[in-house]
Amino acid sequence: MVWQRQHVLGLADFTPEEYQMVLQTSASFQEVLTRRLPKVPTLQGKVVVTLFFEPSTRTRTSFELAAKRLSADVLNFSPGTSSLSKGETLLDTARTFLAMGSDLLIVRHAQAGVPQQLAAEIDRRGSPVGVLNAGDGLHEHPTQGLLDLFTLCSHLDPRRPRLELLQGIKIAIVGDILHSRVARSDIYALVAAGAEVHLAGPPTLLPKDFAQFVPGHTLPIHWQLEPALEGARFVITLRLQQERMGEFLLPSLQEYHHFFGLTRQRLRLCHPEVRVLHPGPVNRGVELSSEVMEDPGLNLIEQQVTHGVAVRMALLYLMGGGRIPA
């Protein structure tokens, strides 16, 4: 198998073969991360630039660590202290990094479509530089979708995570789906895997047209939590994106928790071996109760963080010209 994508901008058009390449390569790097010296020279001499125009701790740190574990040189761009504050355009800033000899650009922006604009400019120039979307507006967060997919598959078969493991498995995605780019990427990945995906949330945060989010596929929509949880093997709960909400979308955080917060009692409706995921940061007592948060036998949140490094290593490696491990 040969990786063909120059840019990873979203999962809407990912093929099953591409998902499998990412899962297989991520598993190899997950093993690397358990070694006494968790570093390989595969991207030595490559320059990786993180262009984060939106606050981020987890994603930025995960990408930076992934690049350094691959021995790449990492440049962190800070918009507040850059020429952007002096009137330079985003494209001009990107052109500067291209002229410096960058190999990969990791882009996070509050506006949907910015990574696509940069990728289009790179393609227009005929440059081999790759763009990796680290989250753009309400569009997508592909690396979170891929790490969630890897976490689920690895939980079911740690030695050989693969797409078909999720075939027919009921997975509930709960919460602020309207404002969640994570939900969008997760939906694409899980539907591609053949999972039975259910969406649950308040009507103001889960429009009914999400049922047709994936062309040719109808997703069950639940405005009450219990039907979505019944028999679910996994539950992915989402952070309430209060910074993106209008003031009338939720009566209060307490009311949200009352109707949609995950508690140990509610999780009894699920499969006996249910596991909970959350992209972080978690609002304790809102999306998840503390008892669920503190039970490592119930949630996979720490595994998501660990797997995030391996998955981002895999993508950087593949986009940087690496070969698929046998």
Swiss-Prot record:
Q: Does the keyword Lyase apply?
A: no
Keywords attached to this entry: Pyrimidine biosynthesis, Transferase
The EC number(s) this enzyme carries: 2.1.3.2
**GO-annotated molecular function:** amino acid binding; aspartate carbamoyltransferase activity
Question: Where on this chain does carbamoyl phosphate bind?
Answer: 58-59, 108, 141, 144, 280-281
Do you know which SUPFAM superfamilies this protein is assigned to? Aspartate/ornithine carbamoyltransferase
The reaction(s) catalysed by this protein are: carbamoyl phosphate + L-aspartate = N-carbamoyl-L-aspartate + phosphate + H(+)
Q: Name the job this protein performs.
A: Catalyzes the condensation of carbamoyl phosphate and aspartate to form carbamoyl aspartate and inorganic phosphate, the committed step in the de novo pyrimidine nucleotide biosynthesis pathway.
What family is reported?
Belongs to the aspartate/ornithine carbamoyltransferase superfamily. ATCase family.
Task: Give the matching HAMAP family.
Answer: Asp_carb_tr
State what protein this is by name. Answer: Aspartate carbamoyltransferase catalytic subunit
Q: Which organism is it from?
A: Synechococcus sp. (strain JA-2-3B'a(2-13))
